[in-house]
Amino acid sequence: MHSLPVNLVLTVLTVFLTSPAQVIGYRPYPPKTNGSDQIFDASKKFEGSSNLVRLRYHMGPVLTNNITVHPIWYGTWQKSQKKIIREFINSISAVGSKHPSVSGWWKTVQLYTDQTGSNITGTVRLGEEKNDRFYSHGKSLTRLSIQSVIKSAVTSRSRPLPVNPKSGLYLLLTADDVYVQDFCGQVCGFHYFTFPSIVGFTLPYAWVGNSAKLCPGVCAYPFAVPAFIPGLKPVKSPNGDVGVDGMISVIAHEIAELATNPLVNAWYAGPDPVAPVEIADLCEGIYGTGGGGSYTGQMLNDHSGATYNVNGIRRRYLIQWLWSHVVSYCTGPNALD
């Protein structure tokens, strides 16, 4: 594997809307290093650890109530693909999964509190779902038309999704033939909240796209690799679907940040609330001990050679680490330290 210096790149991959609102964006592939990387001490024991990171609480709400995730399946999805994603969501709160587990990964999220000292919930469950198999808003979506898709899901005459502003998360998942504004070039997923002027309610939501046809080397890394890293070989995906296995880490990233910063006024670093650096942004591309730069860190392999770092209920997944504000470093349940 092509090796670059072990460090954390704090170039936050957030994207600005052309409309007045701005949305957090994320892409998992290894960023190109630059001079700012040198502020991090590669000899530190814990990945991404730095006294220079100032993740602060800005007094906004976090999700202390039990979380219900409502997937919206936009476009054509195979049953096998839906099952991979559903089982990941159900694994977040699962007890008894083999170590290292998805639920162990979520414990870092649970460290975060609101202004009363209440921790983020340990209960995340799969809620009602909505299928939009006929591409109701076309195959090319803007950031604002995404909100229109969510509006259609919660106002549908036939089995609308429940409206739950306090503990509901609305997860829009687009099929591999759908293009979303800035997809592949700048983001693989983002989260924000809906505007009452469009949807009728303020609802925390996230979008994640299947990159299998459009840009797997960008959004399904390390199951596919970007062209700017010559000689680097992809690893085998744990569930046999490069696009969906690549989505899992992006979904994990966005759910963790929705829980800790649902209205973009709670936990984040940086001076700008409309372009915050959040708990998953700080650990982008780190999946194991030693991770940073273009190196994912030490991961695990199953008997078939597939790569993963956490166990779910019945499946294995590869998901990025998260920032712990308690100890000021990126951490995950598969850490070797």
From Swiss-Prot:
Q: Which InterPro entries match?
A: EXORDIUM-like (IPR006766)
Pfam entry (one): Phi_1
Q: What induces it?
A: By brassinolide.
Q: Where in the cell is it found?
A: Secreted; Secreted, Extracellular space; Secreted, Extracellular space, Apoplast
Q: Which residues belong to the signal peptide in this entry?
A: 1-25
Q: Carbohydrate attachment sites?
A: N34, N66, N119
GO CC annotation: what is one? plasmodesma
Keywords tagged on the record: Apoplast, Glycoprotein, Secreted, Signal
* Job description of the protein: May play a role in a brassinosteroid-dependent regulation of growth and development.
Q: Name the family.
A: Belongs to the EXORDIUM family.
Task: Give the protein's recorded name.
Answer: Protein EXORDIUM-like 3
Q: Which organism encodes this protein?
A: Arabidopsis thaliana
**What does the organism's lineage look like at the top?**
Eukaryota, Viridiplantae, Streptophyta, Embryophyta, Tracheophyta
